[in-house]
Amino acid sequence: MAVFDTPEEAFGVLRPVCVQLTKTQTVENVEHLQTRLQAVSDSALQELQQYILFPLRFTLKTPGPKRERLIQSVVECLTFVLSSTCVKEQELLQELFSELSACLYSPSSQKPAAVSEELKLAVIQGLSTLMHSAYGDIILTFYEPSILPRLGFAVSLLLGLAEQEKSKQIKIAALKCLQVLLLQCDCQDHPRSLDELEQKQLGDLFASFLPGISTALTRLITGDFKQGHSIVVSSLKIFYKTVSFIMADEQLKRISKVQAKPAVEHRVAELMVYREADWVKKTGDKLTILIKKIIECVSVHPHWKVRLELVELVEDLLLKCSQSLVECAGPLLKALVGLVNDESPEIQAQCNKVLRHFADQKVVVGNKALADILSESLHSLATSLPRLMNSQDDQGKFSTLSLLLGYLKLLGPKINFVLNSVAHLQRLSKALIQVLELDVADIKIVEERRWNSDDLNASPKTSATQPWNRIQRRYFRFFTDERIFMLLRQVCQLLGYYGNLYLLVDHFMELYHQSVVYRKQAAMILNELVTGAAGLEVEDLHEKHIKTNPEELREIVTSILEEYTSQENWYLVTCLETEEMGEELMMEHPGLQAITSGEHTCQVTSFLAFSKPSPTICSMNSNIWQICIQLEGIGQFAYALGKDFCLLLMSALYPVLEKAGDQTLLISQVATSTMMDVCRACGYDSLQHLINQNSDYLVNGISLNLRHLALHPHTPKVLEVMLRNSDANLLPLVADVVQDVLATLDQFYDKRAASFVSVLHALMAALAQWFPDTGNLGHLQEQSLGEEGSHLNQRPAALEKSTTTAEDIEQFLLNYLKEKDVADGNVSDFDNEEEEQSVPPKVDENDTRPDVEPPLPLQIQIAMDVMERCIHLLSDKNLQIRLKVLDVLDLCVVVLQSHKNQLLPLAHQAWPSLVHRLTRDAPLAVLRAFKVLRTLGSKCGDFLRSRFCKDVLPKLAGSLVTQAPISARAGPVYSHTLAFKLQLAVLQGLGPLCERLDLGEGDLNKVADACLIYLSVKQPVKLQEAARSVFLHLMKVDPDSTWFLLNELYCPVQFTPPHPSLHPVQLHGASGQQNPYTTNVLQLLKELQ
């Protein structure tokens, strides 16, 4: 709070200080004065303003050299006084302005003085404070012609500082001060709004500075990006505000044709400018050059705030100077249109706001409306578009397409004037087709196969994102920037929204038919045209535009859909028909013992991958992409039509399901995504809901097409996809079709077996999922290595049981005799015995009908029929079919596990072929067959005991013994070979099989002998773990023999006889010396304790 509130009190305090400063001009005296001033109120300072200013001004005007520090102190003190008071006299304002400006001028060199940065900053702030302190209209009286030389000097001084100084702080301060001098200050209520006469007077005055200001600011704006965005933003703002004020159409039209004689001295009169038509024309031409240069630089500036200020520049100049800067209209509009799709949302929003403003104001540039200028620009751009797309880099393409998109947004429905020109439409379509050409040389697209039918499963929850957000990533020949593709899609959508849809669809359909080279690009464009025509996600700047009629849109979609799904465009070659030719090479060394490494498999893969020339791969890639684009199109059509797409489901759903079952992974994924788009559009909760609701139509189509399989070879895939994505409610509907499939398989087993077996696999997988077995019929044997290894930390259950009773022994012997009969092949006796022991069902005493077995459930009947076919196909010459058949057979056993009377006879039939697969087939088939063996052992173990011990166990044991030395010597790469995987699978499966089949002592010894060598630490770690799991299972069957066998390998303790009459026990492993088996044996013995 001020101490001295009245002028009298303040004068008494300030007078001695002012007198002292007048006598002696030192920094200390100035600082003393400023200290005293801070204790005086503003009102008192206002009364004593000139008295206080006198010693300060006297110090500045004293002739002779002065120290910079003194001048800086005086200027800072002067600024403090001006910030607390108002200047109410014009003469004082002008004198102070001159005195402050002179602080930075060197009379000797007639150039800006070489002073410190601190002094420069102080003077700039002083000038700014002085102009703000001008009271009321005094500021306007300052800008009279007589001030022109002094004002010009200050403007030149500030421009020089802004352009040449290295200090960013001084640059920004100089630009802000320049804004104040040109009455462009951002602060509120300064200055007040000007009337027409005042605007004209100031415009005439400022016109003298326009050349210097515009050229200097242009140099600043187009300078190095490193100078900082704030300097460029300030320069841009001063540039367009100055130009739009001086060149404003409203001012220039009031300029009289006869120049009035100025009432000023001759020297000043020479500096003044008369803004007549000739001057406007010449100045406009020069400004056009500068504006083009600014646009070229600023439109690609990395900082968004600079680009945003460019939008303000365009708006200001086009709204205020559309007549005086008529030549700038094109470049300015081009800049604005190019920023419509800027990456910054703030710039996009501002651009759209400005464009709407232009539309509301109906801006006229010269004698042309804005729409006419845009149409001419679009014509010109369409003409040069093919050349630009062919010659520009990615950034150039992005800028050009942004420009095209902006023109389309602005013109709206008026783009039809361009599209109705055949030449321009052809050039536009040629450019789009050219730039959208795909790169189809990637071999991975063909290589990626959907080997596992589980890939057909789709999540029941559909994504909330728009279909085009999930479009498959693709690679183009002529660009790599993903933003360009997004721009191209937006261009096509806007064409579909505003353009004549019938004309565009007909034109691009003609290109679709014209050449295979154009087909993919034309399909992409057609997809986006439909999406745009629906008006979804299209930003409409023209509120009166009428969207395409839904019925017309549906008709157009129907015609495109028919073309997409036609025979010649839907069923294209996407893979080599002989892709399984390498099977004979796989069979070169049959049997388990032949698998020593994976090199033969590698050779086959290499042979297959490079057996066809590159053009064939390119053509297949091209076909794959065409199908994917058409599938994506169906999804986009569904999104565009919404519920109306339900009317097209009859023609669209079946073909899409065919492709969802395609072996090419890319096609299958895109088709599944398309089905999810259809679900969302038509109001279905999930794919399951979609399929179940349309199953009658689909089943009818499958049944009809199976009768003409040669014409419809993809029919089984539809049923396969249906089964993968439905529930048990579908089974009664497809039961007849399944019988048709089996009948057709019997007829075409030598030609179409692969596709039918895939269907059977999907069917059995679905049945296993829909009808799980609820009884306690044994554990599933497909356990991972981790599950097997977990037994190492558990005590065997057999060792934890309570003491065995006499009844347990009796029951054990009875079970043993019964199982012995079964093992000898007495299946019928076993069945009869089971029937005798079963409790007869209760019947009504009055019912005299003979006993009739209840009919088998539908899924059991189907599983039996399928298993019969699989038994016959187990010996197929095609390896891939055999592998699939083994998978199906495994699932059949799972489905039939609760109906032993049906399962056991079929297992008996399948056994010879299964043994052949286990012992004399390719390694992959052996692996798959062993999986089936484990499942059989789990579901009907007693039935397999003798067969397994006789036909399979010797070969398995022999294979393990033979391979053990190889795996012990192998390096880390060995774990990736097929031989290793087969060893691992056998070791993991032997333990559960031995336990489930309850093998005898001799057979258990065979297993133990074969697995002992894998307890060596020289073996791979995973094989050691699997071998330990075998012995953990053997402990449950025969713990005594297992304990003895392990101690024979390594015995950690010496056994002392409990009585001297007993002979000491000598075990081979009791030598005390450790061996390769010690570690694993100790772990296993610990489990037995």
UniProtKB/Swiss-Prot annotation:
The keyword tRNA-binding does not apply. One of its GO terms (cellular component) is TTT Hsp90 cochaperone complex. Changing residue 887 to E: In NEDMIM; likely pathogenic; results in altered mTORC1 activity; affects signal transduction in response to DNA damage. Widely expressed. Changing residue 123 to E: In NEDMIM; likely pathogenic; results in altered mTORC1 activity; decreased interaction with MTOR and RPTOR. Phosphorylated at Ser-828 by CK2 following growth factor deprivation, leading to its subsequent ubiquitination by the SCF(FBXO9) complex. Phosphorylation by CK2 only takes place when TELO2 is bound to mTORC1, not mTORC2; leading to selective ubiquitination of mTORC1-associated protein. It is found in: Cytoplasm. Coiled coil: none annotated. Pfam families: TPR_TTI1_2nd (PF24176), TPR_TTI1_C (PF24181), TPR_TTI1_N (PF24173), TTI1 (PF21547). InterPro entries: ARM-like, ARM-type_fold, TELO2-interacting_protein_1, Tti1, TTI1_rpt. The keyword Membrane does not apply. SUPFAM superfamilies: ARM repeat. Residues 842-852 have a biased composition (Basic and acidic residues). This is TELO2-interacting protein 1 homolog.
